[in-house]
Amino acid sequence: MEEIAKRIKPVCAGRPEQKTLKAMAPVLKNPILAPDEERIIYEVCRGASLPEDKDIIKDNNIRYDITKIHPGRLGPSTALGVNKELPKTFGHYHIPKEATEIFKVISGRAMFLIQKYEDNPEIIKEVYLIEAGENEKIIVPPGFGITSVNPEKTELILANWIGREVKNDYQFYEKLRGACYYLTENKKGEIVFEKNHNYKKVPTLVKL
């Protein structure tokens, strides 16, 4: 399946979705400071498959998606313009919450920020950072939301498997202006983890 992720025009079940900087504004640390609002940050091909794999995918009731996160920082994270936010996906939980998602890095290097709440989405109980390189896989356990981040200066291509009936739930990421941490880069090129103060409680980030 990985070969279709590297094609210029992979076979999608529908039209590829594109997220511009303007569309990402609800989850950026400082959206009003971000220039070039029509720039495409990432694009998703949902339900991708090769013709010979369609029956297998259908019989197992699963879906294969491809996500490309383009390089390029998203603008300063503060008015002082010291740190710049890293390119990322919007972030989502799953409906139903019991769903499990598997990601594989096709090319590039990824940082996955996964977080979990119990009753109140403003109170995060667990948050982890998982780094993965080419050909490495991660599993998003039930109940966790995920944001995928591209820390490099090159394109990041991800593939994921998810149940066909599972829906992405974006509402709490939008309401709380992103994940519970923002990943930014300082002038030295170091990655900085800034807490999102729209959450009532954020635990210490655990790096796996």
Per-region residue spans from a language model:
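Active-site region of the double-stranded beta-helix
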Residues: 1-132, 150-208
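Histidine-centered metal-chelating micro-motifs
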Residues: 136-138, 142-147
